């Protein structure tokens, strides 16, 4: 068991260090929101009693594998939440997007997010993407500030392979995997697909995904009451 004490960024760094090894990860929230670090820092003794008694729930979470034109990195990297392409300068970038070699759209704007179900409550949510239960077998493609009123997020099966072709000749661009930032050239291409490896999140047995949605994001809460 790996225990990450901090916020979601701490847990994502721990996941990166595991490199897909089948070791459960438990996040104890000492940060601000802590959606993935669902165990509260108050009452640590009770939490570790549950660990010792084997009362944790282990949830498998899918990861993504992104292969492409990193400037100074290996060709392939893994992520738990999302892969993003983002503009670095003032101008728009264009991202041709394909699913299983079929053209989906060319997104003109600030970039594109490819999210896992786990990452659907992170950056993708801020870009208007849907909340996806972590057990769903899908990926979400969300445009970032698209210069087109008809562009909306799209949900695809996680058996598909996504190809992104980036044209950033008018503005510098970079890509991210979770909290890690990578430089790229003006014209780069990446393929994103579900990774063979999974991450196993260990959570207290009395905390569900929907509990976390309500408690951390006020989901479904009537603010008038």
Model-derived features: positions:
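N-terminal glycine-rich "phosphate-gripper" loop used for MgATP/nucleotide binding
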Residues: 4-8, 15-17
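Short glycine-rich anion-binding loops that position phosphate/pyrophosphate groups of nucleotides
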Residues: 7-10, 31-33, 118-120
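Gly/Ser-rich helix-loop-strand patches that form or flank binding pockets
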Residues: 13, 18-28, 35
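Short glycine-/acidic-enriched loop or helix-start segments at secondary-structure transitions
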Residues: 13-15, 36-37, 124-126, 151, ...
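Catalytic core of DAGKc-family lipid kinases
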Residues: 33-110
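ATP/nucleoside-binding phosphotransfer catalytic cores, i.e., glycine-rich phosphate-binding loops
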Residues: 71, 77, 85-86, 90, ...
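Gly/Ser/Thr-rich active-site loops/lids in small-molecule metabolic enzymes
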Residues: 106-110, 114-150
């Amino acid at each position: 068991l790996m225990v990450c004490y901090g916020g979601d960024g701490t847990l994502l760094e721990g996941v990166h260090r595991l490199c897909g090894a089948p070791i459960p990860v438990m996040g104890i929230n000492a940060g601000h929101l802590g959606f993935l670090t669902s165990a509260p820092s108050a009452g640590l003794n009770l939490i570790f009693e549950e660990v010792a008694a084997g009362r944790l729930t282990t949830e498998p979470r899918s990861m993504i594998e992104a292969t492409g034109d990193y400037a100074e990195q290996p060709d392939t990297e893994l992520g738990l939440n999302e892969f993003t392409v983002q503009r670095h300068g003032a101008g728009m970038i264009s991202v041709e997007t394909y699913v299983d070699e079929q053209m989906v759209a060319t997104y003109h704007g600030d970039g594109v997010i490819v999210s896992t179900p786990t990452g659907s409550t992170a950056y993708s949510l801020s870009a208007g993407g849907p909340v996806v239960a972590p057990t769903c077998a899908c990926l979400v493609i969300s445009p970032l500030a698209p210069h087109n009123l008809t562009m909306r997020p799209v949900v695809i099966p996680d058996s598909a392979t996504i190809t992104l072709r980036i044209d950033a000749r008018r503005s510098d661009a970079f890509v991210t995997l979770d909290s890690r930032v990578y430089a790229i050239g003006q014209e780069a291409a990446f393929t994103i697909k579900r990774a063979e490896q999974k991450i196993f999140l260990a959570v207290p047995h009395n905390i569900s995904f929907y509990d976390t949605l309500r408690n951390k994001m006020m989901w479904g809460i009537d603010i008038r009451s």
